[in-house]
Amino acid sequence: MKTLRLNNVTLEMAAYQEESEPKRKIAFTLNVTSETYHDIAVLLYEKTFNVEVPERDLAFRGEMTNYSTSLTNLYEPGAVSEFYIEITEIDKNADS
């Protein structure tokens, strides 16, 4: 499992893909539990991130360009959902 940092928050990815043309883009899966759902949702609402993938020596400013989840009701204790997220590089001076 690879480690990802979004805006200085460390996350453990269950799956990971990387592209570099025409812009850097990562796609990854997170297993989100009912206990971690709120914190992950608040983070993802930021939409624009400082992205770091230490194992790949990769760092860039990016925006979430795709998102899906396997389960929408994470309010039940013990529930786990697979979040699929894509983040694409943006201009370093861009801000949303």
From Swiss-Prot:
<dbReference type="Pfam" id="PF11514">
    <property type="entry name" value="DUF3219"/>
</dbReference>
<dbReference type="InterPro" id="IPR023105">
    <property type="entry name" value="YkvR-like_sf"/>
</dbReference>
<protein>
    <recommendedName>
        <fullName>Uncharacterized protein YkvR</fullName>
    </recommendedName>
</protein>
<dbReference type="InterPro" id="IPR021596">
    <property type="entry name" value="DUF3219"/>
</dbReference>
